[in-house]
């Protein structure tokens, strides 16, 4: 039995990784028990998976029981003691579970290095994050490994969509680091060029009002802000290209999700993008742009309008995910982790 513990309640990278880890563990016949806050939005999705069992508490109660080492929750304490391996998804949890360092893996979702000095295993999701840690903490007592995320295989791209207007999709939390102001600016440039593209931006967040105001002030007709959708996969299947102009992105689960749905990707050179696309992005389904460069976003969208170019990038994107970032690969890496630490 494998145990995961998280304090996170929102949609996003941690929620998605709990799902992908559960599916990967199922491929190697491992049960996945998960301790999380009772109001975590991912709970219902996890309950639909055959190998998952949920143990939920109010977040404040979960903090209390972690602090008291679950002395008042013997069932939870037994879960921790009896588990083959424990994954934690928030770095602040490490101090509560140090005694289990021999079977404890902290998944470094953010790429930041806080709380990474310990005797447990640091699991980095990008090679860049791993190398950053090693360069700063070469004498660390922790075990340090790289396990990228994994994605389900979907039917191969067989033909181009027949959209009369190039449909560009983007998604994420409306915060500064996602770079969506640059996407709005690129929409302005495209509209001035009378270029036939429509940008749909899914998400929400503190910058939503500012983004809407900017779109209205510029009288832009080629970009729409849309709230979160329960099935982004359906939206990917309708689109022609995915654009993510982030200023930082530790892995970019959403990049992989777009690619497995057959979308070429326009992206900045974040840690996650470099992990996925490497030094020759077009062969792996992507086009790099510089940070804070709306003119380059515009140019990349115009380049991708070419049908032959777009189809080749779409095929390369899906092949890249199938070959390098599948659930099967993730499951093998997890099995190796458990066996090597046994």
Where are these regions (language model features)?
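N-terminal strand-loop element at the rim of the active site
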Residues: 4-66, 144, 205
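A conserved mid-protein helix/loop that constitutes part of the nucleotide-sugar donor-binding site
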Residues: 12-23, 166, 170-189, 199, ...
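Donor nucleotide-sugar binding/catalytic pocket of nucleotide-sugar-dependent glycosyltransferases
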Residues: 106, 119-156
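Nucleotide-activated donor-binding/catalytic signature segment of Leloir-type glycosyltransferases, i.e.
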Residues: 212-227
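Aromatic "clamp/platform" in nucleotide-sugar-dependent glycosyltransferases that forms part
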Residues: 228, 247
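Short hydrophobic beta-strand element within catalytic cores of glycosyltransferases
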Residues: 264-267, 278
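Conserved acidic donor-binding segment of nucleotide-sugar-dependent glycosyltransferases
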Residues: 279-294, 303-308
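A short, well-ordered alpha-helix in the C-terminal region of glycosyltransferases
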Residues: 309-324, 330-336
